[in-house]
């Protein structure tokens, strides 16, 4: 058990630079694959892949800049940041926090419209370029609302600091001071933003599951697809299912800890850190989902990591083809 309120801080001081660098590297590799290894069959999907990757790069960047833990009080909440933003001002960190939350919503929306695009392709047989851009732009409406709402509320960091010190007298918060926070967690703005984020956190995965099930059925009974194309399309949809469920699964530990803390009054220090970790984790893991479930990218990775193995496979395939002819 932890002996002080900052016992996890050294670990996360190491975790965020390491996680941030790895996420940027893997996202850069993914962008290269999208640009150079996407076959013609993925032309319509590329803009959605680009969009998702870019949003996730922004997500991990804002998480690194913040490196915050969220400490809740009875009527307020403190945003305790140790990232680069803390060297500027509490206001900068608070703005960064809201941008991060909006970007987190945007990352979920990016996956949702990718699933929606696949559905429209199967229903309409073709999605026009204008429709594609409209879908991408529309996916930013809700995140933009989430971003704007907090700026209409009153920011009183001194009040948030006072209530935090009063309700958590055993905490050593000197390493964070001065810090930002919400002075009134019951304000209409706070509740509205929380409601929208909750809808996004739970509604997007559930909606994606319902839609992907319909897409898989459409693929199975599609009369103009070859079996090979059907298999590749199904593999891609399975990847989208994993992507859409990842945020939902990631939020369970931190949300469960939050419920436990609110209902029992006992603190779970790790959960204060896990809220940010779980929100940013998809930016680190999502590239691997694309590497595996998008077959051309998987083949490109294998060729790069195991060139000799791929060469042997190509040789055997060529010999088999020659023998057949």
From Swiss-Prot:
InterPro entries: 7TM_GPCR_serpentine_rcpt_Srd, Nematode_rcpt-like_delta. The chain crosses the membrane at residues 14-34, 45-65, 75-95, 97-117, 132-152, 190-210, 235-255, 275-295. Keywords: Membrane, Transmembrane, Transmembrane helix. It holds the Pfam family 7TM_GPCR_Srd. The keyword Lipid metabolism does not apply. Coiled coil: none annotated. The keyword Membrane applies. It comes from the Eukaryota. It is found in: Membrane. SUPFAM superfamilies: Family A G protein-coupled receptor-like. One of its GO terms (cellular component) is membrane. It is a multi-pass membrane protein. Belongs to the nematode receptor-like protein srd family. This is Serpentine receptor class delta-59. It comes from Caenorhabditis elegans. The lineage of its organism: Eukaryota, Metazoa, Ecdysozoa, Nematoda, Chromadorea. The gene is srd-59.
